[in-house]
Amino acid sequence: MAKDTVEILIEGGSATPGPPLGPALGPFGINMMQVVEEINNKSADFAGMKVPVKVSIDRDTKEFEIEIGTPPTTSLIMEELGIEKASHEPGADIVADLPIDKALKIARMKFDSLLANDYKAGVKEVMGTCVSMGLSVDGKDPREAQKDVDAGKYDDVLVE
């Protein structure tokens, strides 16, 4: 029962049987349309962003498993805010403001790869990334917003 793994980078939600997927998976003789459909379903949340995809194929049974990685937190934040670059001077130059609901959305997208045990801690991790990007969170310094999360100010938004 030999398994092969193919790792590729695709645009979320828009994989096609053509390159880079087709040439990489074609030699294994698996149903390409089934693979493409599953990749597109699993990566739909990351539409427009490059996402790492890992396809594990059993050579004997032609069965496959698809694992979708997540883009870096900085990429998700920039996509949500529609900005192209973070600040060159994060402490002095604030380039955008991340609303708490978008911080929660990003924390949910990244939750499996974050170190957080719950969404509250995940949102704080996303806010920590905002510090190094030169962003404010809900109009405040991200460190202040993290303190507000600890104090329970956003509990109504952060409910499961």
Swiss-Prot record:
What processes does the entry annotate via GO biological process terms?
A: translation
Segments forming a coiled coil: none
What's the superkingdom here?
Archaea
Q: Which UniProt keywords apply?
A: Ribonucleoprotein, Ribosomal protein, RNA-binding, rRNA-binding
Report quaternary structure and partners.
Answer: Part of the ribosomal stalk of the 50S ribosomal subunit. Interacts with L10 and the large rRNA to form the base of the stalk. L10 forms an elongated spine to which L12 dimers bind in a sequential fashion forming a multimeric L10(L12)X complex.
Native source species: Methanobrevibacter smithii (strain ATCC 35061 / DSM 861 / OCM 144 / PS)
Gene responsible for this protein: rpl11
What GO cellular component entries does it have? large ribosomal subunit
Q: Which CDD domains match?
A: Ribosomal_L11 (cd00349)
Report the protein name in the record.
Large ribosomal subunit protein uL11
Task: Show the ranges annotated as biased composition (Basic and acidic residues).
Answer: 138-160
Q: Which InterPro entries match?
A: Ribosomal_uL11, Ribosomal_uL11_C, Ribosomal_uL11_C_sf, Ribosomal_uL11_CS, Ribosomal_uL11_N, Ribosomal_uL11_N_sf
